[in-house]
Amino acid sequence: MQALEGIKVVDLSRALSGPFCSMVLADLGADVIKVESGPHGDMSRAWGPFDRGVSTYYLSCNRNKRGICVDFRQPAGLDVVRRLVAQADVVIENFKAGTMDAMGLGYAALSARDPRLVMGSVTAFGPRGPLRDWPGFDQIAQGYAGLMSLTGFPDGEPTRTGTAIGDLSSGMWVATGVMAALFERERTGRGQHVGTSLLESLVALLSVHGQRYLSLGDVPRRTGNAHAVIAPYGVFETADGPLNLAPITSDMWLRLCQLLDLPELPDDPRFATNDARVAHRDALKALLESRLRTRGKREWTQRFVDAGLPAGPINTLDEVFDDPQLAHCGLVEPVAHPTLGTLRQVVTPLGGMGDDVPAPRTRHAPPLLGEHTVDVLREAGYDDDAIDALLAGRTIFQADAVAEAVQ
């Protein structure tokens, strides 16, 4: 039995932050009902690249859910959503602040009917304050939170991270908050509304950079692939490409000098202390690379690791997914998809550390648009006549009818 088995989640979110949150809950055993607005569904379904017509963006964050398609614009459609929510333990949403209240689905209204309900929300800038009504996506928040000012090279422009870290981190924060709220509900019998924003999530991830400013008033700047306060640390060129090297202690620094046959460096005043090495990092990098360029990155990596020095290659994604370590981690699992056949996916990285601890597992693929509409409505208490009427009125959509409705 998985930790969240028996917990029912109604996921009203779209795009990435909310769906990622609910996928984490689904991977841990929750029964997640993904409710998409008909007839077109989650906006991410239109975002490429596509695998035989299916968005890989959508596939990345909707595993282990059952999917229904409802026209929210119709009163009967909202009634369907309200009935599903009334039977749920958790509701996830990432609408603009105030939208849920306007639909009659705000936490105050829902919790008045069911005090045990837990709601998890993600907004762009928070539910209060002067920016509560601002629209925002990941890159907008990365810039506003200062993250882009820290990312990139000193002589280059501010740079976004290579993945949607604001969306993903806010999803993880809310998943954590939902689980804490469910645990608290066991003690008090009451649910609660937990939430975060892209802005808050990214500011929380500033970590030492944020503390440096709050404590010292220093405004950190971009340092490229170098560490702001440790040297040597970062990317170094070898004979056949770059590798990462991070000898962060004094003992590691001495071992590095011995391994590279540079015994004079520790006595050089420019490199005798970490602060001195940071001040002269460019000169130090040139000296280290003069040795590193004599061998390839794989050979150097093995030599460094054998000497107890943290190092590793800088892989492309084909190298990542072909790496045997990934297979040992069990991070990629196959799942049967209704139209794509066998689909490989990266799973939630919470493998059990013992045989008696169940790891998250893939139960079913990301749903087709409206794949489980009829089944879910039957479970919710709708009889076949009512379901047929909703289908005929284009209030709900079942998978085999969605393509026709969109045309």
Segment roles from a protein language model:
Residues 231-307, 311:
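Aromatic-enriched alpha-helical interface/lid elements that frame and gate functional surfaces
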Residues 127, 155-165, 186-202, 221-228, ...:
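Conserved Rossmann-fold dehydrogenase catalytic segment
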Residues 39, 125-126, 198-203, 240-242, ...:
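Glycine-rich beta-alpha junction loops
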Residues 305-329:
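Conserved PLP cofactor-binding pocket of PLP-dependent enzymes
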Residues 336-389:
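Flexible, small-/acidic-enriched active-site or ligand-binding loops
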Residues 58, 223-228, 233-234, 340-347, ...:
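Short Gly/Pro-enriched turn/cap motifs at secondary-structure boundaries
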Residues 1-187, 368, 374-407:
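N-terminal helix-loop segment corresponding to the beta1-alpha1 unit
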Residues 171-191, 204-216, 257-264:
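Oxidoreductase and adenylate-handling cofactor-binding alpha/beta cores
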